[in-house]
C-alpha cells in the first residue's frame, strides 16, 4: 500500500499549515519525501515495491510543487527497477499480517523486522543519495524533499558550482526515506565532517533523527538547522523555505572560502529587498472575481447572519456580509447545532460549495436534520474547485441529484435559484415540492426560508441551490466552442467594472 499525503506547509489554500511527517511516524509507516515530479514517479514505484518487501504501508509526502507541476522526465526502466536486499532475516511465515495475529507479535514484527527491512530496501535501491562528495569534506548538508530543489537554486544564485563545492570540501546528502532514518548511512555521511546543516521545510524532522544517529560517535560534527549551536533562529520552522532563507543560512554557516562574488552580490540584493519590506504598504482585502455568482449568492437578508465555509465563498468573511466563523471542509453549518441553544438568534445561513457537499458536506446536512436545527444551507454550485485550479469536483454531482438527495435526507423545503429557472424544471430526479426561482428573487427566497420553522414535526432545514458556474469557467467554455457558449446562455446585457485610478497632476 502506498499512502499519498497531501500537505500544505505554507497554508496557501488551507486554513492551517500541515505536515504528514509526524502522523506517519506515529503510525510507524515508512515515509518517502520526493523533491520533484521525477521523484514522485520513482518513489511511487519504489514505494510500492518497498511495501511488498517490508510488509508495511509506505507513505509519501505530496506538496503542490511536486503534484501540481509539469516536468520533462526521461523514463528509464533501470531507474525504476528494484532489487531486494541480501542477507536480511525474515520470519519463517513471512512479514505480512495474518489472521489471529496476537498484538505483541505484530508489534515485534513491525519494530524488529519490517522497519529494518525498509531501511535496507532504501539503501539497496538508492533512495537516499550522496549527491555531492569530496575526498576532504569538512562541511555537510543534509536535505530532504522539495527543499533539495530550493537548495540547488540557492547554490546557483551564490555561484557555487559542483566542482567548486567539491574542491572546498562540501558534502551533500539527499534523504529520500525521511522516516525511519538510516542510522548507518547517516554515520557514514557524517564521518570526518565538522558541521552539518540540515535543510527541511517547516518543522524539524530529519534534524533530530540525525542527532540521535550521531550521538554515540567519538567525533561527531555540530548539527545546525532550525537553530544554530547557540540556539539562535537559523532556518524557519513555520513554513516552506525559499532560496533567500537558505542562502542566508549558507552565508552564515559555510566556511569563508565559499563566499564568492556572486554570493556577496546576492546577499547585498537580499538586504536591499529586506529594507524595502519595512516600507508601509496599503492593505487590500481579497474579493470575488468580476462576474462571480458568489458575489450575490453569499449575501444574506438584513438582520440575518451566515457561517462561512471552505472555498472561494470563504472570502465573504472579509466583506461586509454578516458572515463569520468557519470550520473544517465538510463541517459547514455544524457549529450552529451547538451554538443555537445559547443565543437569541433563531436562524442562520451556512455556505457550502458543491464539491464539499459531494464528498462530505452532506453529512452536515444530515447532522442538522437529526438535531432539528433551524438553518438554511446554501449549496453554491459552480461545477469547479475554483480555489485550487478549477478542477471538476470529484463525483460531479449535479443540481437534480443534489435536490433529490437533500429531499431524501429530510430537508423540509428546497428552492433552486439560477439565471435560468426553467433549465431543471420538469427533471424527474427533482422532487415536485422543489421551487424554481430567478436569481433576482434571491433575497426574497432567503427571507422566506429563514422564516420556516419546519415542514414536518422535526425538520427545520431549507436549502438553496444557485445553479451558476463560476465566472472564469464561463469564459473558458465560451472560448472553446460556440456549442459550449450556447449551453452557458449568457445574458445579452453585461456589466463591466471600471477601475478609476487617481493620478496626481504633475508639479512641473
List the model feature ranges, each with a label.
Residues 58-59, 205, 259, 349-350, ...:
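Acidic/polar loop patches that form or flank catalytic/metal-binding clefts of enzymes
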Residues 1-52, 63, 295-298, 305-387, ...:
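Thiamine diphosphate
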Amino acid at each position: 500500500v502506498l499512502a499519498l499525503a497531501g500537505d500544505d506547509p505554507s497554508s496557501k489554500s488551507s486554513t492551517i499549515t500541515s505536515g504528514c511527517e509526524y502522523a506517519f511516524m506515529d503510525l510507524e509507516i515508512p515515509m518517502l519525501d520526493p523533491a520533484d515530479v521525477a521523484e514522485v514517479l520513482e518513489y511511487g514505484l519504489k514505494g510500492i515495491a518497498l511495501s511488498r518487501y517490508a510488509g508495511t504501508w509506505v507513505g509519501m509526502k505530496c506538496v503542490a510543487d511536486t503534484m501540481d507541476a509539469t516536468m520533462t522526465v526521461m523514463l528509464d526502466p533501470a531507474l525504476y527497477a528494484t532489487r531486494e536486499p541480501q542477507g536480511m532475516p525474515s520470519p519463517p511465515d513471512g512479514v505480512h499480517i495474518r489472521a489471529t495475529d496476537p498484538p505483541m507479535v505484530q508489534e515485534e514484527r513491525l519494530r524488529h523486522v519490517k522497519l529494518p527491512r525498509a531501511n535496507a530496501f532504501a539503501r539497496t535501491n538508492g533512495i537516499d543519495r550522496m549527491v555531492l562528495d569530496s575526498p576532504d569534506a569538512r562541511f555537510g548538508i543534509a536535505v530532504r524533499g522539495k527543499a533539495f530543489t530550493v537548495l540547488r537554486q540557492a547554490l546557483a544564485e551564490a555561484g557555487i558550482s559542483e566542482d567548486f563545492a567539491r574542491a572546498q570540501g562540501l558534502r551533500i546528502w539527499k534523504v529520500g526515506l525521511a522516516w525511519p532514518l538510516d542510522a548507518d548511512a547517516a554515520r557514514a555521511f557524517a564521518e570526518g565532517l565538522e558541521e552539518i546543516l540540515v535543510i527541511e521545510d517547516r518543522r524539524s524532522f530529519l534534524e533530530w533523527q540525525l542527532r540521535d544517529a550521531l550521538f554515540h560517535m567519538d567525533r561527531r560534527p555540530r548539527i545546525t538547522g532550525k537553530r544554530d549551536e547557540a540556539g539562535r533562529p537559523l532556518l524557519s520552522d513555520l513554513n516552506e523555505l525559499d532560496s533567500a532563507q537558505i542562502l542566508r543560512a549558507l552565508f552564515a554557516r559555510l566556511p569563508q572560502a565559499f563566499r564568492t562574488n556572486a554570493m556577496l552580490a546576492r546577499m547585498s540584493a537580499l538586504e536591499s529587498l529586506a529594507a524595502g519590506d519595512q516600507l508601509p504598504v496599503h492593505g487590500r482585502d481579497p474579493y470575488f472575481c468580476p462576474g462571480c455568482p458568489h458575489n450575490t449568492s453569499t449575501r444574506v437578508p438584513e438582520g440575518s447572519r451566515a457561517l462561512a465555509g471552505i472555498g472561494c465563498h470563504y472570502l465573504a468573511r472579509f466583506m461586509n456580509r454578516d458572515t463569520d466563523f468557519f470550520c473544517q471542509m465538510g463541517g459547514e453549518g455544524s457549529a450552529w447545532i451547538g451554538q443555537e441553544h445559547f443565543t437569541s438568534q433563531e436562524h442562520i445561513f451556512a455556505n457550502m460549495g458543491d464539491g464539499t457537499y459531494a464528498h462530505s458536506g452532506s453529512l452536515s446536512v444530515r447532522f442538522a436534520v437529526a438535531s432539528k436545527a433551524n438553518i438554511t444551507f446554501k449549496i453554491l454550485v459552480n461545477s469547479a474547485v475554483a480555489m485550487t485550479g478549477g478542477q471538476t469536483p470529484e463525483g460531479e454531482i449535479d443540481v437534480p441529484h443534489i435536490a433529490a438527495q437533500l429531499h431524501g435526507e429530510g430537508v423540509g423545503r428546497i428552492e433552486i435559484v439560477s439565471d435560468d429557472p426553467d433549465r431543471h424544471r420538469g427533471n424527474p430526479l427533482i422532487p415536485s415540492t422543489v421551487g424554481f426561482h430567478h436569481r433576482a428573487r434571491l433575497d426574497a427566497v432567503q427571507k422566506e426560508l429563514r422564516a420556516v420553522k419546519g415542514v414536518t414535526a422535526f425538520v427545520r432545514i431549507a436549502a438553496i441551490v444557485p445553479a451558476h458556474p463560476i465566472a472564469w469557467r464561463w469564459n473558458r467554455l465560451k472560448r472553446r466552442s460556440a456549442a459550449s457558449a450556447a449551453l452557458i446562455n449568457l445574458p445579452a446585457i453585461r456589466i463591466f467594472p471600471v477601475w478609476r485610478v487617481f493620478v496626481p497632476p504633475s508639479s512641473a
